Amino acid sequence: MDDIPEGFAPHVRKSPVTDPWEPLYARKAEDRLVLGTRVREVHCNSRSMPHGGFLAALADNAMGLSLGVSLAAARQQVGGLVTVSLTLDYLGSAKLGQWLEFDTDFIKLGRSICFTEATVRADGVAVARARATFKLLEAKAAA
């Protein structure tokens, strides 16, 4: 159950929100960051399926991180990102032990608002579709 797909390495960005769900993994793609994890009991509801809130939180993280990659590539300076809207369509269910990937497949950059979409897959099969809108925070002026 510890086999990690090729290209994934331990995710280095830590957060109190995601700490209970470790280990998390990341794979850098050309224009985004794909998050991954193996479904464990701590991720699951009483039916041994990943909880919808868990899927939503990691989809939000993957989209925000991928947006950061795109903003850096565009040399757009920002002081941070804030999720202003997040929706998920649950398309199926995952099971204990499956490999989950959170892959951002659409990013539209704006000057103050950005839009993203992601697909959540369990062993390669889509189980959720996420959409988020992010507000770009102004970068602080150098003192």
Give, region by region, the residue ranges found by the protein language model.
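Terminal targeting signals and extreme-terminal segments of soluble enzymes
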Residues: 1-143
